[in-house]
Amino acid sequence: MKGKIIKGIAGFYYVHAVDVGNTMGTVYECKAKGVFRKDHRKPLVGDDVEMDVLDEAQKKGNIRELLPRHSELIRPAVANVDQALVIFAITKPQPNFNLLDRFLIMMQQQDIPCIICFNKQDIDEEGKKEDYRAIYEQAGFRTITVSAAKKEGIDTIQELLRGKTTTVAGPSGVGKSSLVNCLQSGTVMETGSISEKIERGKHTTRHSELISIAQDTYILDTPGFSSLGLFRLEKEQLAEFYPEFAPFEKYCRFGGCSHIS
């Protein structure tokens, strides 16, 4: 049976398998075969796998094969991500553009397309949303504005996520959890015990987890956003990640200038 790893805790992997006649699927608690350790291969959240069901009633299984990956992120450690959705608030709190740019660069370094989502458009009293959208669309990023509180723009996000695995990130206070709740509204997996199984991991550091929100559509809630750091990058390389600045380079009379003053 084929499935996708949605969470890993303490050597257990939770595999989401879509059954015939059950589009929301079933989650099985699985162990990975020792051959993966021997081959120095570690299953990751997001991996597509072949599994054997050991106990259908208890939803237990074994992962016997890791299927080829089309992408692999290092931060967070996850496989087969198609795109990233980064969420900031238009206001309350004010967006930290330095943090946003760092995330965009980090995803570009790993060849992952990014969608920028500005939440809380319902309280945008200063009319900033069009300014923010223009800045990042000029840089080549798909940028949308929504309101989780008013459920405005949710259909747009759902359409952008359809049929893909998307890592979702954002600092605290921007309404990321509210948006995730809107996206997964009405999606219930067959097994009612998955939440109980995953409770075992409460004593551990928070893990990344894939959430199935529609058929073949997953979102990954990304922890640790505020402590983002870039991979090693020389300042001369930063220009590659700011294409919107390229048209102005010819006006600088200093060769090799970093344009920092």
Question: Where does each model-flagged region fall?
Answer:
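Phosphate-binding glycine-rich loops and their immediate beta-loop-alpha structural context
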Residues: 91-140
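Helix-rich effector regions associated with P-loop NTPase G domains
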Residues: 11, 24, 34, 39-59, ...
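A conserved segment at the C-terminal end of the G1
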Residues: 176-192
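SH3/SH3-like beta-barrel fold
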Residues: 13-19, 30, 51
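Canonical P-loop GTPase G-domain recognition
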Residues: 122-174
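Structural detector for short beta-strands of small beta-barrel domains
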Residues: 1-10
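Catalytic P-loop NTPase motifs of RecA-like helicase/translocase cores
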Residues: 94, 124, 152, 186, ...
